Amino acid sequence: MATERTFSIIKPDATARNLTGAVNAIIEKAGLRIIAQKRIRMTREQAETFYAVHKARPFFGELVDFMTSGPVVVQVLEGDNAISKYREVMGATDPSKAADGTIRKVHALSIGENSVHGSDAAETAAVEIAQFFAGNEIVG
């Protein structure tokens, strides 16, 4: 198995409900290591850059507003097949369709307030990690 790194965000709906520890417990139970983590208030510029792929979509403004509405926890996760494993642990974007025991099934409020983000590919993970972490902040 390939050891990989992936990027995670615990979103404002989850941090507002003090769920960081609960989400981290699910992540670690799945065998992923949290090798970098910080709680930040995402700026509008950071959110617009991060979600630039959705700029033409009708929900872009609401997404940026949501992601800047409160603190988020940005993380680097590491483990065997970390990208696919974390996507499995997160569950489907729509919490009503997420598998039992996944982060979104347990904690998400709606499709929009779905508690977490995870990278979808190695290339995306590298870009997302670099947007929020300097190399010396990642301690594997």
From Swiss-Prot:
Name the Enzyme Commission number(s) assigned to this protein.
2.7.4.6
Question: A Gene Ontology biological process annotation?
Answer: UTP biosynthetic process
Q: Which reaction does it catalyse?
A: a 2'-deoxyribonucleoside 5'-diphosphate + ATP = a 2'-deoxyribonucleoside 5'-triphosphate + ADP; a ribonucleoside 5'-diphosphate + ATP = a ribonucleoside 5'-triphosphate + ADP
One GO cellular component term noted in the UniProt record for this chain: cytoplasm
UniProt superkingdom: Bacteria
**InterPro entries recorded:** NDK-like_dom, NDK-like_dom_sf, Nucleoside_diP_kinase
Annotated localization = Cytoplasm
| SMART domains reported in the protein's UniProt record | NDK
Query: Which residues are catalytic?
Result: H117
Query: Which parts pass through the membrane?
Result: none
Alphabetic keyword roster = ATP-binding, Cytoplasm, Kinase, Magnesium, Metal-binding, Nucleotide metabolism, Nucleotide-binding, Phosphoprotein, Transferase
Entry similarity comment: Belongs to the NDK family.
Function of the protein:
Major role in the synthesis of nucleoside triphosphates other than ATP. The ATP gamma phosphate is transferred to the NDP beta phosphate via a ping-pong mechanism, using a phosphorylated active-site intermediate.
Q: Please name the HAMAP family in this protein's record.
A: NDP_kinase
Q: What is the protein name given in its UniProt record?
A: Nucleoside diphosphate kinase
